[in-house]
């Protein structure tokens, strides 16, 4: 009987640990959002109608989520891929928004900027992201940051 109890406790421990690991990205995302003071608002449409800084196609845009973001760190192929333009623009918007808030420690900065980037890709259209990034001087920074050897990597 005691062996069965020990085995049962071990299984419960394994299930609780697995559930904790599975929930961790979502919990960190929610914590990061809780640390953000206010939400950025998308810009109005660019007068020219051309919002992107590059000619990269914006078709097939997939909003980010906490689990796919965390999973990319364990996938060598994902780490080698070029970061989609929409994700770079969303990160730029999140970073600029957080710069306007009181400064905090580095861990809080990274957690809140990542969570806000994910939130922006989930709640704004690709056009809203591009227009807002352009308004936030992303195009000027983007042209300076492009490496002569090729596009930025993850």
Predicted features by range, described:
Residues 2-154:
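Juxtamembrane regions of bacterial inner-membrane/periplasmic proteins
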